[in-house]
Amino acid sequence: MAGKKKKNTKEKKQKKKWRYALYALEIILLLILIPSAFCIYKISQIETYHMDQNKIEENEFSDSNIGNYTNIALFGVDSRANELTKNTRTDCIIIASINNKTKEVRLASLYRDTYVYIADHGYTKLNHAYAYGGPELAISTINKNFDLNVHDFVTINFSALSNVIDALGGVDIKIKKDELKWVNAYAQDVARINGTKVKKIKKLGLHTLSGVQATGYCRVRYTSGGDFTRAKRQRTVIQQIVKKAKSADPITLYQLMDEFLPQIYTSLDTSDILSLASGIFFYDIQANFGFPFDSATPTINGASVVTAETLSSNVSKLHKKLFETVNYSPSSTVEYRSNEIASLH
């Protein structure tokens, strides 16, 4: 009898241990599933654009390395009415090229005033393409003029950028003498649009800029270098955002998602976004640069534009810098456009 009681007590203790283990497992699963469910819910709030891939045009060209990279077009629009789809010009055009194996990232700013051929519109500034035909025409224009294979995009306006930076606690930026008054002026404009207030920056040097201040910094163009240095500022801010995100705690990252994801417009679906987001801690921005590399700023048909000298040689350099390609030759389309642009100025 005593032996039976001892056995029952042992069984009860064993069941109790299993119950605790199950409770612990349930808690662990909840801790995993709740954040995952939150992420999926937030991603579902993104304004997804189901792009007609048949409308995306590419040239026939040979580049043995380009297939090892995921290339995404990043468009920044200065839309006061939160218009992200089209009918607005792109102030920022960046190709983010991600090495699928190493997760190294290269950022190429395509200067917005670059003189290119846009289908059905002729030669004009690159930033007009998005306004004329939305993402499809903008991406096709990029692909056709620069021998690229971009098929996806992310569009964001300046209000969303400001919110992202604030969610990360600001970004560290060094303010130079010729930038100071313009950063303050543009920051005031951003604050007015956002319905917020902003502190005036009074000293030169390193500052942790708020979202509004950093967005103002991204918009400055009236300094030495004009749009070239503005594009560089935009890449600097992106680098700082990635740096901050990589070191952020989970709560900050959830806050970032809460602020950012509902305010973007993209062709990427949920699985694409989750796949890209899973690599955030491994992404390493190895290089950033502006395109074209060798350029002139002539006036053509009354408009000041940026022309490559020559387009074909600059596109060759672009492929080398983005994809480390050594055996690429420009397509016949790029060669033709290169000769036509050269004859116009």
Predicted stretch roles:
Residues 2-103, 275, 301:
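Entry/capping segment at the start of metal-dependent catalytic domains
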Residues 65-71, 77, 84-89, 119, ...:
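Solvent-exposed, acidic/flexible segments
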Residues 67-70, 88-93, 102-110, 121, ...:
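Extracytoplasmic
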Residues 81-84, 124-132, 147-152, 204, ...:
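Second-shell loop/turn segments in exported
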Residues 92, 123, 135-143, 158-162, ...:
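Extracytoplasmic/secreted envelope proteins and their assembly/folding machinery
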Residues 132-196, 267-269:
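Amphipathic, coiled-coil-like alpha-helical scaffolding segments used for oligomerization/assembly
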